[in-house]
Amino acid sequence: MESTPFNRQQWTSLSLRVTAKELSLVNKNKSSAIVEIFSKYQKAAEEANMEKRRSNTENLPQHFRRGNLTVLKKKWENPAPGVESLPESTRNSSAEVRHRGDPPPAEVASSSASGVEADQGVCPRPRFSSPPEVPYPNPRIKDTEHLKDHSAESKKMENCLAESRHEVGKPETSENAEASNKIEKYNVPLNRLKMMFERGEPAQTKILRAQSRSTGGRKISENSYSLDDLEIGPGQLSSSAFNTEKSESRRNLEFPRLSDTSIKDRMAKYQAAVSKQSSSTNYTNELKANGGEIKTHKLEQKENVPPGPEVCISHQDGEKVSASENSLAACSTPPEDDSCKSQVKSDVQQPVHPKPLSPVARASSLSESSPPKAVKKFQAPARETCVECQKTVYPMERLLANQQVFHISCFRCSYCNNKLSLGTYASLHGRIYCKPHFNQLFKSKGNYDEGFGHRPHKDLWASKLENEETLERPAQLPNAAEIPQSPGVEDAPIAKVGVLTASMEAKASSQLEKEDKPAETKKLRIAWPPPTELSSSGSALEEGIKVSKPKWPPEDEVSKPEAPEDVDLDLKKLRRSSSLKERSRPFTVAASFRTASVKSPKPLSPPMRKGWSLSEQSEEFGGGVAAERKQMEKASASEKNGSVGKTTWPSKESRGGEAAGRSKEVQDFEIGSENLIENGASLDEGDRDLLQQQSPLEPKSKNWSSFADNTSAKEFTTQKQKSQDVEFWEGEVVEELSVEEQIKRNRYYDEEEDEE
C-alpha cells in the first residue's frame, strides 16, 4: 500500500488507508486479518469511485463534465473534432454560466497567487477540474504563440486558474496533485514571456478603455475570447471555450480588475494612439469583415439563450472587445504594434452600431443611452442669487417674494432685521419691512415721503429747484423773514437774531443726522403735538444749549391785555429822566444775567416764590439793600438791587410809604414789561437773575430780616429808577445786540464777578 499525499477529494479512501496503517503498526505481533479486511474494503471503494466517475463524465453533456483527464488528453491529441463542435461548446458554456450561481468572492483574493501559471496558461481547465498532466509539445508551442499574440487572454486566464484551483477541493472530482506540481515546474522561455508582456500590455489597457468608455464599466462578456479564436488555429479552440466560460462566470467580480492600470498611464497611451491614428485606415476593412463574422457567431449563440438585459449588454461588450482583439490578431510583428494601438483607438472612437439584436437588447441599449439626457435636463435651470446676500439660492432655501429671490434666512425686515414670512411682510421701493414698522413709518401717519429718505410725494408737489434751495439754505445766512422754519416755529413771530441762529443750527444738525440715521430723525420730526415752549420765545443762548427750564411766567400774569402805546411813552420818560451814566451802565453789564442763569442754575424754583407772602418779599428786598449798601456806586451793586426792585414791585402797595407819582410810574413800567413779554422778550430771564442773586446773598446775611426796618423810602425810590432802566434796556436791546456783542459783555461780567 503506497502512501500518497493527502487530497481532500479522496478523503474516503485515504481515511481507510490511515486506519489500516495504524492497525498494522499497533498490532504487529498479532494476526493481520483486520488489516487485510481493511485493505480489501479500501480497494473496493476506490474501484467503485472510479467507475462512478467514468460513467458520470461519459453520460453527461459536455458542459456538465467535471474534469476527467483522459477526456482532456483526447482533446489535446485530436484537435480536429473540436473545430466542428465549437458553436455547441460555446453555447453550452454560456448556458452553464447562467445555471450556475456566482462564485464566492473569496476567489478574487487568491488570484494573485497564481501569477506564474496564469502567464503560462498552457492548459485552461473547465470548472471543478483537477490539474491536468503534462500536455504534449505541439499544443504547448501553439499555446505560447496564442499567448504571445493575446496577452489580454492570458490575464483573464490568471483569474480563471485561480478560481478553478479553489474549486478543486470539492468532493465531486478526484485526481492526485502530481500534475499540479508538474505544471508549476513548466516554464515558458523568458524572452517569449518578455515579448508577450511588452507587446500585450498596451493592447490590454486599450481594450479596457474601450470597454469602460462604451459600456460605462460593464463586465466582460462570454463572447470576448471565444469568437476571436477563429483566426488562431484549431489547437486553441477548446481552451478558448473553457476560458470563455470562466470569464463569463466571473463577470460580477471582474470590474475591480479593470481599474488596475492608473488613469495617468491610460491617458498617456491614449494620446500616443491618437497621434498615430492616421495609419489606422488600412485596417477599417478588416474590422468590417470581422464584424460580419462576429454577427453570425453571435446569432448562433443567441439560439439557446433566454433574452435578458444583462446578457444583451454583454453581447454588445463582446462585440466591441472582440473587434478590437481581431485587429490585434492581424498585427503579428512588433513594428506594427503602434498601428495596432491606433486601430484599437479608432475602433473605440467609431460609434459601434449594434448588430441585429432581439427587441429586449434594443430596449436595454436605449435605456442605457437615456440617463445622460436626464442629467442634462437637471442641470438646465439657471443659477439664482439672493437679492440680500448675493449668494447662490438652492431650491430648498428659495423664497420668491415681490418678484425677487431670497434665502429664507435672508428674508428680513430692513429696519428691525426680524425674520419674515410671505404673510408678514410689506414692501416699499424694493425694500422689505415687517408690517408693524411699515404701518408706523409710512401708512398710518402718511409719512411716505419722509420715512427712510424716500420722497416720492414731495417730488410731485414741489419742483427739483425748490428742493435744492431748501437743501442749500442752511449753508447761507439770510434775513429772518426769508428763513422757512419748522412747523412748530412758524406759528410764532420770529423777532430775535438769537432765536433765528439757534433754529438754523438745529435745522442743519437735524439734516446731518438725517443723512446718517434717516429713520430715527424722521421719527423725531413727526412728533405730535408740536412743542409750544418756543411760542413764549426763550432766549437764543438757552435754546442753543437746550437747558430745561420750568414753565414761567405764570399764565395769569401773561394773560393781562395791555396796550403797546403805553410802553412807548413810558420808555421815553425813562430815557429823559435818567442820567447818561445810568443809561450807559446797563449796556455793559445787563446782558450777563442770561449767562449767569445758564451757567449755574440754583435749586430754588419759581413755584416756591409764589408761596411767599408780600411781607417776606419786602424783607428780602431790605436785607439785600443792607448787605450791599457800601457798594452802591459800583455797577454790580446797582444791577443786583435794580433787579430785586424790579421783581418785588408788589411790596410798594402793601407798605404805602411811597409817593403817588412814583407808584404811578411803577405801574406804567409793569404794563410795559408785560407788553414786552408778548413781543418776544422773556420775563422769566429776570426771575432767573433774581434767583442767581438770592443764592449768593443768603450766606452773607443770615440775619437779613433784622435790617428790613432800617430801609428808607428814598433808597427804595432810587432803586426803582435803576430797575426801570434795566428793564428798559432788556426790552430795547434784544433787537439791537448781536450774539457776538452778548458774548463780549458776558466776558466783562465774569471779570466783575471776580472783583466782588
UniProtKB/Swiss-Prot annotation:
Low complexity bias spans: 107-118, 533-542
GO terms of biological process kind: actin filament bundle assembly; cell migration; cholesterol homeostasis; cholesterol metabolic process; intestinal cholesterol absorption; negative regulation of cilium assembly; ruffle organization
Organ and tissue specificity: Widely expressed. Highest levels of isoform 2 are expressed in lung, spleen and small intestine. Isoform 2 is expressed at higher levels than isoform 1 in most tissues except liver, fat and kidney. Isoform 1 and isoform 2 are expressed at low levels in skeletal muscle, heart, stomach and lymph.
Entries under InterPro entries matching the protein: EPLIN_Lim_dom, Znf_LIM
Chain positions found as N-acetylmethionine: 1
PROSITE patterns from the UniProt entry: LIM_DOMAIN_1, LIM_DOMAIN_2
Annotated region described as Disordered, given as residue ranges: 44-183, 204-377, 508-726
Residue numbers spanned by region Required for interaction with MYO5B: 489-509
UniProt PTM: Phosphorylation of the C-terminal region by MAPK1/MAPK3 reduces its association with F-actin and contributes to actin filament reorganization and enhances cell motility. Ubiquitinated by the ECS(RAB40B) complex leading to its degradation.
Cellular localisation: Cytoplasm; Cell junction, Focal adhesion; Cytoplasm, Cytoskeleton; Cytoplasm, Cytoskeleton, Stress fiber
Record-listed Phosphoserine modification sites: 15, 55, 130, 221, 226, 238, 259, 339, 346, 358, 365, 370, 486, 597, 600, 605, 613, 695, 723, 738
Residues recorded as bearing N6-succinyllysine in the entry: 435
Gene Ontology molecular-function annotations: actin filament binding; metal ion binding
Annotated keywords: Acetylation, Cell junction, Cell membrane, Cell projection, Cholesterol metabolism, Cytoplasm, Cytoskeleton, LIM domain, Lipid metabolism, Membrane, Metal-binding, Phosphoprotein, Steroid metabolism, Sterol metabolism, Ubl conjugation, Zinc
Main location (coarse class): cytoplasm
Presence of the UniProt keyword DNA repair in the record: no
CC annotations in GO: actin cytoskeleton; actin filament; brush border membrane; cleavage furrow; cytoplasm; focal adhesion; plasma membrane; ruffle
Chain positions found as Phosphotyrosine: 225
One Pfam assignment: LIM
Residue spans of biased composition, Basic and acidic residues class: 44-56, 140-173, 245-254, 294-303, 512-523, 552-563, 627-637, 652-667
Biased composition (Polar residues): 274-287, 638-651, 691-721
Residue ranges of domain LIM zinc-binding in the record: 384-444
Function according to Swiss-Prot or TrEMBL: Actin-binding protein involved in actin cytoskeleton regulation and dynamics. Increases the number and size of actin stress fibers and inhibits membrane ruffling. Inhibits actin filament depolymerization. Bundles actin filaments, delays filament nucleation and reduces formation of branched filaments. Acts as a negative regulator of primary cilium formation. Plays a role in cholesterol homeostasis. Influences plasma cholesterol levels through regulation of intestinal cholesterol absorption.
Complex and partners: Interacts with NPC1L1; bridges NPC1L1 with MYO5B. Interacts with MYO5B; bridges MYO5B with NPC1L1. Interacts with PXN; this complex stabilizes actin dynamics. Interacts with F-actin and G-actin. Interacts with LUZP1 (via C-terminus); both proteins restrict ciliation and may work together to regulate this process. Binds RAB40B (GTP-bound); interaction influences LIMA1 subcellular localization in lamellipodia during cell migration.
Comment field on protein domains: Contains at least 2 actin-binding domains, one on each side of the LIM domain. Both domains bind actin monomers and filaments. The C-terminal domain binds filaments more efficiently than the N-terminus.
Protein name stated in the entry: LIM domain and actin-binding protein 1
